[in-house]
Amino acid sequence: MIITGAPLDYTKFEDVDYWDELTNIMEWSKKHVHCTLYMCWAAFAGLYYHYGIERVDREEKLSGVYKHRVLKKSSPLFRGFDDIFDCPQSRAMTVNREDVEKIPELEVLAVSDAAGVAVIKTEDSRQFFMTGHLEYDSDTLAKEYFRDLDKGMNPSIPANYFPDDNPENKPVVRWRSAGQLFYSNWL
């Protein structure tokens, strides 16, 4: 099962209208689903619900394509991956790696110097938490950027995304093969 994110940015989990329904689904998945992948906002929500790990709100939304390091090269999830892979990130929160590592059932599989913890799994490999967006199309970050501009927000240009940091330039995709591998390996 995949539980995906939502553009809720700084909204506290308990303030989300459907938090009770979501936690019911998360609880149900523990007994009725072989493996659950929590993506972006849902990763932080899942870590909070299942393990009490508090999210840390960022002062500025993280948006762009960042280098990530595979820490556990023997993990079946990263079979075929290079040591370093690019992954889009688009989020207003993070978790402290130290908080994750305090939980014996959790293992950090990939990190980024710029984006922090990227992929976490449970000891039994029944839950995976992915903070980024390997599923993004080439124009998804652009659409988010222009959407936020249209809302009157002042978003930063997504890092490492538009050639020459110019939003008029077509983005170059550097994460597609990693995304294909990630989801194929997860399945």
Q: Where on the chain are the PLM-derived regions?
A:
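Redox-cofactor binding/interface segments in oxidoreductases and associated redox assembly factors
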Residues: 2-3
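Cysteine-nucleophile active-site neighborhood
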Residues: 6-72
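Amide-donor transfer/coupling interface in amidating biosynthetic enzymes
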Residues: 70-187
